[in-house]
Amino acid sequence: MAKKVSAKIKLALPAGKANPAPPVGPALGQHGVNIMMFCKEYNARTADQVGMVIPVEITVFEDRSFTFVLKTPPASVLLTKAAGVEKGSGKPNKEKAGTITGAQLRQIAEQKLPDLNANDVEAAMKIIAGTARNMGIVIAD
């Protein structure tokens, strides 16, 4: 018989640096999850992606056990890293924050493809290009 799900929790945590302090502790503690066990597993599975923010979806069962699924880093994090800027422009229509190449755009789209609502890389590139435009990042051809 399948276990009954008691909660689903979504968090965005720095890779390899999850610790019991907020926001992890309170989010998991209220559902009775072993926080240290989650932190150790998360840090082990994201050790190769240090420096990125990795969203995670945690499914908590009624017996207080849990499973979690790692997602791809947010497009905004990948774009700022590719453009070499700290954050997007406050006024994307007037001020440009940085520039990325078409090849970098394709690489980000391929990386994000599993989490995007797109069937192919071309559609994913359009989605990522829209995010870049809203951040004030120019795509050079």
Swiss-Prot record:
Oligomer and partners: Part of the ribosomal stalk of the 50S ribosomal subunit. Interacts with L10 and the large rRNA to form the base of the stalk. L10 forms an elongated spine to which L12 dimers bind in a sequential fashion forming a multimeric L10(L12)X complex.
CDD domains: Ribosomal_L11 (cd00349)
Species for this entry: Gloeobacter violaceus (strain ATCC 29082 / PCC 7421)
Ranges that cross the membrane: none
Source superkingdom: Bacteria
GO annotation, biological process: translation
PTM info: One or more lysine residues are methylated.
The protein, known as: Large ribosomal subunit protein uL11
Keywords in alphabetical order: Methylation, Ribonucleoprotein, Ribosomal protein, RNA-binding, rRNA-binding
GO MF, any single term: large ribosomal subunit rRNA binding
The UniProt record lists the keyword Cytoplasm: no
Family of this protein: Belongs to the universal ribosomal protein uL11 family.
Function: Forms part of the ribosomal stalk which helps the ribosome interact with GTP-bound translation factors.
GO cellular component: cytosolic large ribosomal subunit
PANTHER family linked: 60S RIBOSOMAL PROTEIN L12, LARGE RIBOSOMAL SUBUNIT PROTEIN UL11M
Keyword RNA-binding: yes
